[in-house]
Amino acid sequence: MIALHFGAGNIGRGFIGALLCKSGYDVVFADVNDAVINELNDKGRYTVEMADAGRKQETIGPVRAINSATQLDELYDLIAKADLVTTAVGPAVLKLIAEPIAEGLKRRMKINKQPLNIIACENMIGGSAHLREEIFARLTETERAAISDSVGFPNSAVDRIVPIQHHDDPLKVTVEPFFEWAVDQTEFAGKVPDIEGVTYVADLAPFIERKLFTVNTGHAMAAYAGYKKGLKTIKDAIHHPEVRQTVAGALEETGRYLVQTYDFTQEEHRAYMTKIIGRFENECLSDDVTRVARSPLRKLGRDDRLVGPARKLCDLGFEPVRLAEGIALALQFDCADDPEAVQLQSMIAEKGYAGVLRDVCGLEEDHSLFKLVISHLKA
């Protein structure tokens, strides 16, 4: 069985690629980083280390890699022959890999009618569906019809913290022991594959929103609040009383939405929330505040981790005070080393907070959340 995985970064190697290898797949990584590609091909394996007191290590392999920008013919052949395609490239890169995947699928339709599933394992809602749209935009109507018959794009929700790495071995990757990979079993073409560690579900929405509005929201809240306090790491931030109160308050708010919307009980969600805060406290996982806070324009999007749950709470008649505080803190993130932070501050200087709340967050001045955020900015 061949699994082609786009993205040989830390998530690709330390999470998705590792599980695919352990499930019996011959894993081929597609990336554009020649240094990593050459290392993977030279060694054929790599080490994954658990970020806990035990520091357990396991060797993952055999694997190989190709350059998805320069080895296009080989890439198309792999797509034509693969039993599974996965991605962990970041939401913004999906549109860049859509073109070669589309070309590979055209080749596949000529030689291989076996079902294929393409799973985007990204920090976004509907990643596989989005990738499908990008791919289909590059196909004719006839090609789309042919591919729809045998290619599935199951959406997934992934969760595993991979801290910043400090290893002499460029392939070694440290990951937290906890992980969650949930995949919508109703969206597969053909047989659902047996992948170690995957949870197959009939309704993915609760898992996606629980993860996005707890892990991602909590991480972002800790980062932006920690940055405002001049703290360096997430561990430092979550141990700061005021920051911890801010994070816990935001997760109480998102929890209210999740419990009211889905079948999670209050006790079940509180246990999950406690587990997530415990992950932030793991000193083996401690990440730089500025790294977690980076890309504020994306994270301030109307459906993302801060504005998304806050808007939903407003729709339910609740006032998301802590989430509004988080949005205000994100708007003040001015790290000079982050291009999006620089762009954000330039936008604020040009059009003010009101303009950014409208154009980036999708909030008009008469929205209750708009007013809440402005009140925090004036405080």
UniProtKB/Swiss-Prot annotation:
Catalytic reaction list: D-mannitol 1-phosphate + NAD(+) = beta-D-fructose 6-phosphate + NADH + H(+)
HAMAP family: Mannitol_dehydrog
Residue sites binding NAD(+) per the record: 3-14
Keywords recorded for this protein, A-Z: NAD, Oxidoreductase
Protein name: Mannitol-1-phosphate 5-dehydrogenase
GO biological-process terms attached to the record: mannitol catabolic process
Signal peptide coordinates: none
GO molecular function (one): mannitol-1-phosphate 5-dehydrogenase activity
PANTHER family linked to this entry: ALTRONATE OXIDOREDUCTASE-RELATED (PTHR30524:SF0), MANNITOL-1-PHOSPHATE 5-DEHYDROGENASE (PTHR30524)
EC number(s) per entry: 1.1.1.17
Coiled coil: none
GO cellular component: cytosol
Pfam families: Mannitol_dh, Mannitol_dh_C
Protein's UniProt keywords contain Transmembrane helix: no
Family label: Belongs to the mannitol dehydrogenase family.
Enzyme class: oxidoreductase
Natural source organism: Bacillus licheniformis (strain ATCC 14580 / DSM 13 / JCM 2505 / CCUG 7422 / NBRC 12200 / NCIMB 9375 / NCTC 10341 / NRRL NRS-1264 / Gibson 46)
